[in-house]
């Protein structure tokens, strides 16, 4: 099985989950592309190239997912514009610095973010039924969260989306469904900025990036459509499991390579 075919399959699965759960897809795409190619006769894809591909997926998947979630009234424009720009600025810095980081350091950062996000997503949440346009967030909390997660997202290529959702729900008290939709818009800012940094430091493979982009066009809107028919608590539980599994696998690889 060629790397191109593996990338296409991984891109479809990741983009579906991106639209469904608001995670940007990188949490699924990263383990797929790191471990599957050698197992099925393909060529191992370098870690830095994989992180570049997750950013491409995040841009296409997040853009389409945001539009679909917005049509359902699940995107807070106020949150997106409050947290998106600072996240983008920090993501550029993280993407440039990632060029000089060892692969296992990048994987460790990925695993820490994923573990923290998955644990937060298991915490009980107070049900809220508030329209997206009425959502308010304290800038003194929202902007620092965006800066920190944007920076680390620029390093590892996933935009810190899973942790952004957890922060929106448990720190800023945003209803889960709106947190999922808004996180895609916030992540889009960071992903575009991080792509600039990754491309400038030769961490993008154009043919594989094109495959990931096309896969997102197909699968992300389908995931978003399924999301609105799923209970918010169930979405958070599914997201937590996906994030935890990815974190465990990545952490084992990082420890073995250190």
What are these regions (language model features)?
Residues 1-24, 28-49, 64-155, 170-171, ...:
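Juxtamembrane transmembrane-helix boundary motif
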Residues 29, 160-164:
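Hydrophobic/aromatic end-of-helix segments at the C-terminal termini of transmembrane alpha-helices
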Residues 53-63, 89-90, 186-193:
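Membrane-embedded alpha-helical segments of transport systems
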Residues 54-58, 84, 183-187, 208-209, ...:
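Short hydrophobic/aromatic, small-residue-rich stretches within specific transmembrane helices
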Residues 156, 160, 184:
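Short, contiguous, pocket-lining structural segments
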């Amino acid at each position: 099985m060629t790397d191109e075919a593996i990338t296409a399959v991984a891109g479809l699965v990741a983009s579906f989950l991106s639209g469904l759960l608001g995670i940007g897809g990188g949490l699924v795409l990263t383990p797929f592309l790191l471990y599957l190619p050698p197992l099925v006769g393909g060529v191992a894809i370098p870690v830095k190239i994989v992180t570049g591909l997750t950013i491409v997926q995040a841009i296409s998947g997040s853009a389409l997912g945001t539009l679909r979630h917005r049509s359902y009234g699940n995107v807070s424009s106020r949150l997106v514009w409050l947290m998106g720009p600072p996240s983008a600025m920090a993501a550029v810095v993280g993407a440039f610095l990632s060029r000089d980081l060892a692969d296992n350091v990048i994987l460790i950062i990925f695993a820490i973010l994923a573990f923290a996000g998955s644990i937060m997503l298991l915490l009980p949440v107070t049900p809220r039924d508030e329209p997206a346009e009425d959502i308010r967030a304290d800038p003194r909390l929202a902007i620092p969260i965006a800066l920190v997660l944007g920076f680390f997202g620029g390093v590892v290529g996933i935009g810190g989306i899973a942790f952004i959702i957890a922060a929106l729900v448990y720190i800023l008290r945003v209803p889960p469904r709106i947190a999922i939709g808004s996180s895609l818009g916030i992540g889009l800012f960071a992903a575009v900025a991080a792509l600039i940094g990754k491309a400038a430091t030769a961490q993008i493979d154009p043919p594989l990036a094109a495959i990931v982009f096309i896969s997102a066009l197909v699968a992300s809107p389908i995931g978003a459509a399924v999301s609105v028919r799923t209970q918010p608590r169930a979405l958070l539980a599914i997201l937590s499991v996906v994030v935890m599994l990815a974190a465990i696998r990545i952490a084992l690889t990082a420890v073995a390579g250190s």
